[in-house]
From Swiss-Prot:
GO terms for cellular component: ribonucleoprotein complex; ribosome. InterPro entries: Ribosomal_uS8, Ribosomal_uS8_CS, Ribosomal_uS8_sf. It comes from Ruegeria sp. (strain TM1040). HAMAP family: Ribosomal_uS8_B. This is Small ribosomal subunit protein uS8. PANTHER family: 40S RIBOSOMAL PROTEIN S15A.
């Protein structure tokens, strides 16, 4: 797998289109940190460590719906393995005039765009969520 974060975002997007309540994805620290941001911003119910059918470590993500519709309307990968996107604190874009969230990997950890601005740090923009 060349893009683990992109794979996880695609699994979430596909599962929500099918109306699934949970989705499994292979475990990694970076994926867990991204899920922490999604949970703190209210886009997923939560996640927990699990094992897949072959015994490999995995993360089971509990998806969130509001009145039968997915809470996440748009989930886009920004920085990709073939084209990394780094931005300074003043260049981090607001998503949909502040209604959405950019997830940024900074030297101080993975955080939302608002937290990155508050901490005055830039970094790699992993994805945007609306």
């Amino acid at each position: 797998m060349n893009d683990p974060i992109g794979d996880m975002l695609t699994r979430i997007r596909n599962s929500q289109m099918r109306g699934k309540s949970t989705v499994m994805t292979p475990a990694s620290k970076l994926r867990a940190w991204v899920l922490d941001v999604l949970q703190s911003e209210g886009y997923i119910r939560g996640y927990e460590s699990a094992t897949d059918e072959r015994g490999h470590p995995a993360l089971e993500i509990s998806l969130k719906y509001y009145e039968g519709e997915p809470v996440i309307r748009e989930l886009k990968r920004v920085s990709k393995p073939g084209r990394r996107v780094y931005m300074g604190v003043n260049d981090i874009p607001s998503v949909r005039q502040g209604l959405g969230v950019s997830i940024v990997s900074t030297p101080k950890g993975v955080m939302s765009d608002a937290n990155a601005r508050a901490a005055n740090v830039g970094g790699e923009v992993l994805c945007t969520v609306f």
